[in-house]
C-alpha cells in the first residue's frame, strides 16, 4: 500500500465564465474519484442529449445537481490525485455565496487556483473594475492564502497566441503584486480546460511555452502542466502543532460521569491529564478523559468532534461559545476588543460607529458594537481610501474596532484561522463578513478547580 499521500485542499476561483467547472471537471475526470460506471452513465446521457462532445463541465454540473438535490454524493468525486498529494477541490460557487463560504467555511484551503479566461474581451471583463477576478484574488490574500497558481484558460480561442499569453501574465502579475502576492512564487500555466492542453500532459499546440517556475524559501521548482503545479504546492503545516483551541458546541451533564463539554478541535490536541482553561469563563480544570463516538481517545486531533470529561466544573460555569485551551501553552483569554477587516455584503442603509449586530465567530453568537470605523479600503487593491470614514455601505471594505457586548473569546486570523473569521448577522441575513487582525485580551484571575491545582503540581 505504501504511505498514504498528504491531503491538500485547493479552492478554484475566477470570473464566472472563466471555465472553472470545465477545468476542475477535467482534472477530476482524468485523475479523480469518479468511477468508470458513473462516467459511462454520464457519457451515455450526454450522447442521448446530443452533448456528444461530452463537456467536462457537464460532469461537474451533474455532481453539483445531485449534491443540491440532497443526494449525498460521495465527496470522493471532488478529489483527484497528483504524484505527491490527494487533492480535494473546495467548490467555489456563485459569487455572493463564495465570499461568505470562504470566510465562514470550515475547511481552509492550502492553495487557490485562479482561472483566467484568455479569450479576447473575456480577460478584460474579468479583470475590469466590476470583474470578480481581482476581488477573488484579494479575498484569497486577505484570508491568509499565500499559495496561488494562475491558469490562463481557453488558449485555444486565442489560436494559442504567445503574445496574448504574455500580455495577460504581465497584467495579472501586476495586480496580484499590488494585492500582496509575490508573482515570482506563482506558477503561470497556459491551458485549455476543454481540450486538455497543459492540464496533465504538455501541449503540442504551444511549443513556445517553456514551462512555469516558482521561487519560494524552499527553493525553486519548474514544470509544464497544471497538474505539476498542483503537485508543487508547499506541503501544508497542519494545525496539530499549534496550541489547543476547541470552541464548545454544547455542555452536557451526564449522570455518574459529570460535566462533559463537546466541540471540534480546531487547532492543537487535547488529551487526558491536560490542565485546560475555558475562556472567557476563566475556569481552569483537568481533563479526565476524551472520547469520540463513544470510544475513548488517547488524543483528539484537529477536525475531531470530541466530548471530554472535566472535574469539579458545573454545567453553569461553562457554555457554548467558550473556548477550551491548554493552560500551559498560550491559553485563550477573553477579548476586550478587536480590530477586523470587514466586507459589507448586503446592508440596506449606512453603517456607522455604534452599529451593534450579532457576530457568529466559531461557535460564539454575540452582539458586538462597531465602536470605531478606522479606515475604508479599496476592495480591489486592498489600499487605504480614507481615514475614519463617517459610514460604510454595501460593497465597502473597512478596518473597524469591535467591542463585544458580553464576554467573548476570539483570536487573530493569522494565529488561529477558525477563531478569526466571522459573519455579521442582522435582519436575518449575513450583512458582512470579516477577518480579525488583532485582539486586545483581558487578563483576569478566574476559578481554578482543586483538580487543576493538584494536576499543575505534578
Swiss-Prot record:
Q: Which domain of life is it from?
A: Eukaryota
**Region G5, annotated ranges:** 192-194
InterPro entries, from UniProt? EFTu-like_2 (IPR004161), G_TR_CS (IPR031157), GTP-eEF1A_C (IPR054696), P-loop_NTPase (IPR027417), T_Tr_GTP-bd_dom (IPR000795), TRAFAC_GTPase_members (IPR050100), Transl_B-barrel_sf (IPR009000), Transl_elong_EF1A/Init_IF2_C (IPR009001)
Task: Give the modified residues of type N,N,N-trimethylglycine.
Answer: 2
Extract the Pfam families matched here: GTP-eEF1A_C, GTP_EFTU, GTP_EFTU_D2
Using the record's annotations, give every residue carrying the modification N6-methyllysine.
3, 30, 316, 390
Report keywords, A-Z. Cytoplasm, Elongation factor, GTP-binding, Methylation, Nucleotide-binding, Protein biosynthesis
A Gene Ontology molecular function term of the record: GTPase activity
Which residue ranges are recorded for the region named G2?
A: 70-74
Where does this protein reside within or beyond the cell? Cytoplasm
Q: Give the residue ranges for region: G1.
A: 14-21
Quick one: where is this thing mainly located?
cytoplasm
Residue ranges for the region (G3) are: 91-94
Q: Does the keyword Membrane apply?
A: no
Q: Which residues form a coiled coil?
A: none
Keyword Nucleotide-binding (UniProt): yes
Q: Which residues carry this modification: N6,N6,N6-trimethyllysine?
A: 79
Region named G4: 153-156
Residue limits of the tr-type G domain?
Answer: 5-240
Residues recorded as bearing N6,N6-dimethyllysine in the entry: 3, 316
Q: Which GO terms of the cellular component aspect does the record hold?
A: cytoplasm
Residues that bind GTP: 14-21, 91-95, 153-156
Per the record, the similarity remark reads: Belongs to the TRAFAC class translation factor GTPase superfamily. Classic translation factor GTPase family. EF-Tu/EF-1A subfamily.
Q: What does this protein do?
A: This protein promotes the GTP-dependent binding of aminoacyl-tRNA to the A-site of ribosomes during protein biosynthesis.
Q: What is this protein called?
A: Elongation factor 1-alpha
Organism per entry: Mucor circinelloides f. lusitanicus
The gene coding this protein: TEF-2
Amino acid at each position: 500500500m505504501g504511505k498514504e499521500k498528504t491531503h491538500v485542499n485547493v479552492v478554484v476561483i475566477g470570473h464566472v465564465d472563466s471555465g472553472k467547472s470545465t477545468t476542475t471537471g477535467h482534472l477530476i475526470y482524468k485523475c479523480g474519484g469518479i468511477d468508470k460506471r458513473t462516467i459511462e452513465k454520464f457519457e451515455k446521457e450526454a450522447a442521448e442529449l446530443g452533448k456528444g462532445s461530452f463537456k467536462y463541465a457537464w460532469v461537474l454540473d451533474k455532481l453539483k445537481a445531485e449534491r443540491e438535490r440532497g443526494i449525498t454524493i460521495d465527496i470522493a468525486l471532488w478529489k483527484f490525485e497528483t504524484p505527491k498529494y490527494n487533492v480535494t477541490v473546495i467548490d467555489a460557487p456563485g459569487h455572493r455565496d463564495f465570499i461568505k463560504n470562504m470566510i465562514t467555511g470550515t475547511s481552509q484551503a492550502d492553495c487557490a487556483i485562479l482561472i483566467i479566461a484568455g479569450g479576447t474581451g473575456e480577460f478584460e471583463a474579468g479583470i475590469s473594475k466590476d470583474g470578480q477576478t481581482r476581488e477573488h484574488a484579494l479575498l484569497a490574500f486577505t484570508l491568509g492564502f499565500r499559495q496561488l497558481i494562475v491558469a490562463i484558460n481557453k488558449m485555444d480561442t486565442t489560436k494559442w497566441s504567445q503574445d496574448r499569453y504574455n500580455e495577460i501574465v504581465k497584467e495579472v502579475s501586476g495586480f496580484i503584486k499590488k494585492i500582496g502576492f509575490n508573482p515570482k512564487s506563482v506558477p503561470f500555466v497556459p491551458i485549455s480546460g476543454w481540450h486538455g492542453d497543459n492540464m496533465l500532459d504538455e501541449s503540442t499546440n504551444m511549443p513556445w511555452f517553456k514551462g512555469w517556475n516558482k521561487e519560494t524559501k524552499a527553493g525553486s521548482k519548474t514544470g509544464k502542466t497544471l497538474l505539476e503545479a498542483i503537485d508543487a504546492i508547499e506541503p501544508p503545516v497542519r494545525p496539530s502543532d499549534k496550541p489547543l483551541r476547541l470552541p464548545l458546541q454544547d455542555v452536557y451533564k451526564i449522570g455518574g460521569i459529570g460535566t462533559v463539554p463537546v466541540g471540534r478541535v480546531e487547532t492543537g490536541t487535547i488529551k487526558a491529564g491536560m490542565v485546560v482553561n475555558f475562556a472567557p469563563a476563566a475556569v481552569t480544570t483537568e481533563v479526565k478523559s476524551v472520547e469520540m463516538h463513544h470510544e475513548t481517545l488517547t488524543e483528539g486531533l484537529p477536525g475531531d468532534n470530541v466530548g471530554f470529561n472535566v472535574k469539579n466544573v458545573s454545567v453553569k460555569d461553562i457554555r457554548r461559545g467558550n473556548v477550551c485551551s491548554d493552560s500551559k501553552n498560550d491559553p485563550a483569554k477573553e477579548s476586550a476588543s478587536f480590530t477586523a477587516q470587514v466586507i459589507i455584503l448586503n446592508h440596506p442603509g449606512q453603517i456607522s460607529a455604534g452599529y451593534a449586530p450579532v457576530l457568529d465567530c466559531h461557535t460564539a453568537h454575540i452582539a458586538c458594537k462597531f465602536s470605531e470605523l478606522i479606515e475604508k479600503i479599496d476592495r480591489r487593491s486592498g489600499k487605504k481610501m480614507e481615514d475614519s470614514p463617517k459610514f460604510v455601505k454595501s460593497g465597502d471594505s473597512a478596518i473597524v474596532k469591535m467591542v463585544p457586548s458580553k464576554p467573548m473569546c476570539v483570536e487573530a486570523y493569522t494565529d488561529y484561522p477558525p477563531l478569526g473569521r466571522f459573519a455579521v448577522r442582522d435582519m436575518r441575513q449575513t450583512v458582512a463578513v470579516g477577518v480579525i487582525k488583532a485582539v486586545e485580551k483581558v487578563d483576569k484571575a478566574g476559578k481554578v478547580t482543586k483538580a487543576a491545582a493538584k494536576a499543575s503540581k505534578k
